[in-house]
C-alpha cells in the first residue's frame, strides 16, 4: 500500500515540476497600453542607445568574442519564449554588448537585449551565470513589466487630473500627480 502511494506522489510531483513554476497571470492593467506602441518606442530607444555607443566606440562589433558569446547564449533561450508570451516569437530579437564599467544588463520590450562589459569583466560570469542574468532580464520583457508600469503611470496621471478638477478646478492636478508618482515607480513591489 505504501509503494503505490509513494509512486503516485512522485508522479504528481514530477508532473508539477515538469511544467515549471507558476508565476501567476499578468496584470490586466497592462492592456491599457498597446504592446505594439511600447515595442516601437523601445526599438527607437534601443537604436538610439546603439548609435550613442557606436559614436563612443563602445558598441561591441558583431565579430567580438563576447558579442558572439552573448548571442549564442540568447539563441539557446529564445526558442522557448513563446511559452510565456506568444507574441514574443514575432519579436526581432537583438543582443548587443555595450562597453561600460556599469554592472548592468537589460531586455527592453520587443526583445532588445543589452549587456554591459562591466558585468562580464567585474563578475567574471560563466555562460550559465550570463544565462541566468539574461533570462531574468528577458522575463521582465516577456511578463511585460514596462507595459504595466506605463499603464499604471497613465492611470495615476488620469486620477490626479480628475481629482485636481474636482478639488480645485485643475489648480492642484500637478501637485496631485507628483504625490501619486510613488504609486507608479519602476520596480515597485505589488
Which residue ranges define each predicted feature?
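Bacterial N-terminal signal peptides
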Residues: 4-15
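A Zn2+-metalloprotease active-site environment signal
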Residues: 15-190
Amino acid at each position: 500500500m505504501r509503494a503505490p502511494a509513494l509512486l503516485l506522489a512522485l508522479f504528481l510531483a514530477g508532473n508539477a515540476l515538469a511544467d515549471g513554476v507558476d508565476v501567476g497571470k499578468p496584470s490586466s492593467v497592462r492592456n491599457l497600453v498597446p504592446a505594439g506602441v511600447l515595442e516601437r518606442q523601445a526599438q527607437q530607444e534601443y537604436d538610439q542607445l546603439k548609435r550613442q555607443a557606436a559614436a563612443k566606440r563602445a558598441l561591441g562589433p558583431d565579430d567580438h568574442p563576447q558579442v558572439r558569446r552573448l548571442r549564442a547564449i540568447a539563441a539557446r533561450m529564445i526558442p522557448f519564449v513563446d511559452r510565456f508570451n506568444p507574441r514574443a516569437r514575432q519579436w526581432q530579437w537583438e543582443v548587443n554588448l555595450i562597453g561600460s564599467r556599469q554592472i548592468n544588463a537589460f531586455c527592453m520590450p520587443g526583445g532588445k537585449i543589452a549587456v554591459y562589459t562591466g558585468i562580464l569583466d567585474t563578475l567574471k560570469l560563466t555562460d550559465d551565470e550570463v544565462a541566468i542574468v539574461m533570462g531574468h532580464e528577458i522575463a521582465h520583457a516577456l511578463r511585460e513589466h514596462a507595459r504595466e508600469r506605463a499603464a499604471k503611470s497613465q492611470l495615476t496621471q488620469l486620477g490626479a487630473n480628475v481629482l485636481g478638477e474636482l478639488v480645485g478646478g485643475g489648480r492642484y492636478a500637478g501637485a496631485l500627480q507628483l504625490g501619486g508618482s510613488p504609486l507608479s515607480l519602476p520596480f515597485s513591489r505589488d
